[in-house]
C-alpha cells in the first residue's frame, strides 16, 4: 500500500486546511510518483536524539531582562511571545522541572477552533482522500499537538481557553486515517514521563517522536492496515 502523510502543528492546521478555496488538484504535468519521492523525508530517532533543540529566541537571547520581568510579574505572559505557568508535577528534567514555557500562538490560535472550522478541515481531507484513493493511495493526517494543549491538565492556575481540536475532530466521519497525537502523548504524561516536549522549545522532543512511531495507533496502519 502507498500512503501520503500530512503533518501540521495544531495551531496552524485550521489556517492551512479549513479553507473554502483549498486547491486539492493534483497536477498531471508531473509524475505523481516523482512528486512523492522528491518530498520524502526519513527520520532517524538516534539522530533526532543528538540534535540540539532550537531555543525560543526571546527567552534565550534576552534571558537576563526576561528573568527580571518574570520575578517581578510572576507566572503568566512573560513577554510578547512566551507564557510561563506552574505545573502540579515535575514533567521536565531541567532546573525548573515544574514550569511550563509555551508559545503565545498556542493561545492566540485557539480562537479559530470552532466546530465549523474543524468540520471544514475534515471535509477537505475527506475530499483529498477520495482523490488519492482513486490512485491507490491512502491519506494520513497527523496534527502535532501544541505544547500548551498537551500540558494544560497539569497547569495549576489556568484561565486560558481549552482546546477542542482533537476532541471534536475525533468524532467526525473520516475517509482518511487520523493519528491523534494528543491522545498518544497524554498517556505518557499520565505516566509522568518527562521531556515529551523540550522545556524551552515549542516543539516536541525525540521522545515524543519515538513514542508516536512505537504506538499501536501508528503501527496498526502499516502492520495491519488498520486505522
Report residues per predicted region:
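Extracellular glycan-modifying ectodomains
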Residues: 1-227
Amino acid at each position: 500500500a502507498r500512503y501520503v502523510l500530512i503533518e501540521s502543528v495544531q495551531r496552524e492546521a485550521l489556517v492551512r486546511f479549513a479553507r473554502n478555496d483549498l486547491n486539492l488538484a493534483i497536477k498531471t504535468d508531473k509524475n505523481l510518483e516523482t512528486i512523492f519521492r522528491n518530498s520524502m523525508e526519513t527520520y532517524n530517532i538516534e539522530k533526532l536524539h543528538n540534535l540540539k533543540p532550537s531555543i525560543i529566541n526571546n527567552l534565550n537571547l534576552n534571558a537576563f531582562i526576561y528573568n527580571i520581568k518574570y520575578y517581578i510579574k510572576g507566572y503568566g505572559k512573560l513577554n510578547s511571545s512566551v507564557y510561563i505557568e506552574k505545573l502540579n508535577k515535575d514533567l521536565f528534567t531541567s532546573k525548573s522541572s515544574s514550569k511550563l514555557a509555551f508559545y503565545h500562538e498556542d493561545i492566540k490560535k485557539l480562537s479559530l477552533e470552532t466546530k465549523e472550522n474543524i468540520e471544514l478541515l475534515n471535509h477537505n481531507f475527506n475530499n483529498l482522500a477520495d482523490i488519492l484513493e482513486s490512485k491507490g493511495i491512502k491519506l494520513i493526517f497527523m496534527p502535532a499537538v501544541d505544547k500548551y494543549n498537551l500540558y494544560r491538565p497539569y497547569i495549576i492556575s489556568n484561565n486560558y481557553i481549552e482546546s477542542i481540536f482533537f476532541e471534536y475532530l475525533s468524532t467526525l466521519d473520516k475517509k482518511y486515517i487520523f493519528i491523534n497525537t494528543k491522545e498518544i502523548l497524554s498517556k505518557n504524561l499520565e505516566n509522568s514521563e518527562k521531556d515529551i516536549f523540550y522545556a524551552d522549545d515549542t516543539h516536541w522532543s525525540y521522545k515524543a517522536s519515538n513514542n508516536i512511531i512505537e504506538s499501536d495507533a501508528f503501527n496498526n496502519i502499516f502492520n495491519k492496515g488498520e486505522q
